[in-house]
């Protein structure tokens, strides 16, 4: 019965948020929910990290210049943006340089050939040809008034005296 009482007590102390009472040399650790040596909570005052025992964790110092996670969050995108910008500037300058080189090499040789070619393919419109900016309309038919309109929008049949709206899904009273 004593073992049961201890088991119930230990489960109760794990589930409760109230820390268990510990000795003066021990401190309550909420992670393991048990009393541990208080020396594990404090880092030694010495500046040498090599003298620490393996398995002890260092707490981050408040006097550190720049935390590595902040440097990664800001530095990595900034470096990536700089690399992309330099690549874009390099590509634009390379394309413009190639374009200038092609213009420089092509201009002395083809200046006369371009003029000859452009004069040979000139189209001179006659006086009967309408102006290029004038719209061209199809000729009107003689029987435009008698032809039925070619629209697909359903219209109400008011000319027959009916007041209901004619749609594609409704059937009129004629049917």
Curated annotation (Swiss-Prot):
Highly expressed in spleen and testis; detected at lower levels in lung and thymus. TNFR-Cys repeats lie at residues 21-38. The chain crosses the membrane at residues 72-92. Residues 124-175 are annotated as: Disordered. It is found in: Membrane. The keyword Glycoprotein applies. It is linked to Defects in Tnfrsf13c are a cause of severe B-cell deficiency. B-cell deficient strain A/WySnJ has a 4.7 kb insertion in the BAFFR gene leading to an altered C-terminus. The mutant RNA is not detectable. B-cell lymphopoiesis is normal, but the life span of peripheral B-cells is much reduced. This is Tumor necrosis factor receptor superfamily member 13C.
